[in-house]
């Protein structure tokens, strides 16, 4: 008998086909009604789950009796109740590294677009406002040779820094819980406190993991430390920045602009951010290219197969469960 796998979000079609060939697959269908109820029904005898973006915790996993793995098609895992998975000896795996360069591309895209008012000017032009030469209201900020501050110099943060250093001759500052000489090497990156980074940087890109320490890391106090011409970009997780404090800072022109791919609550359906010309809002698409999402899905598939065939997968979020049996 084939093992049962729940697909809880849309994934690459080729990977979906492989799943259906090798497992008894149940794909949750929002069009068919309450997804929570579908999950409660099917998780009882599921051996594995694969997908991304859905909150999975003891409330919807409690009926599970055979579940061995949740294979997340993502790097972040803040939507999973890891402590509960540890209690139940359920593997949680993710897909790091394959999306590093793609996410860094988007981070630098947001930096450039916010600095040069790309979204605002696109709308301005399409609205027929280009009657004469542009004026100061349409002017942006230079990027070449400026100072780039990275909050969270992990793989993605370092990839953003490389783009700034090699492509735009930028001076690199970074703040981390600990110095990262192995990643800073070759970038002439200077380690400094968060306050100093905010005070000195022309551009600030946030790439930290979301945890108890980083939640609301950037609040009104930190925004007040930034330069009035500074641009803030967030490609990490929404709760790292106090969203209302950022809105107030943008309204008051306390900073020049912001570029956001993540938010405190997602999907973002209504927000004061939508009323502001000095912020670019994207729908959490840091890794969303055809090639990268395919690689992520393939890696997630392999993680799933490894566990269901009795092997330790390559990327385990909760190594405490290694060696447990179900």
Regions found by a protein language model. Give the residues of each.
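Conserved N-terminal Rossmann-fold NAD(P)-binding element of oxidoreductases
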Residues: 150-151
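An N-terminal-biased, well-structured beta-alpha scaffold segment characteristic
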Residues: 1-93, 219
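NAD(P)-binding Rossmann-fold cofactor-contacting core
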Residues: 166-184
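Hydrophobic/small residue at the entry helix of a nucleotide-binding pocket
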Residues: 156
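Rossmann-like adenosine-cofactor binding region
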Residues: 57-60, 178-272
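Short beta->alpha connector loops at strand-helix junctions that form conserved
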Residues: 28-31, 73-74, 90-101, 194-195, ...
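Phosphate-binding beta-alpha-beta segment of Rossmann-like dinucleotide-binding domains, i.e.
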Residues: 96-147, 159-163, 167, 317
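Rossmann-like dinucleotide-binding domain for NAD(H)/NADP(H)
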Residues: 92-93, 229-326
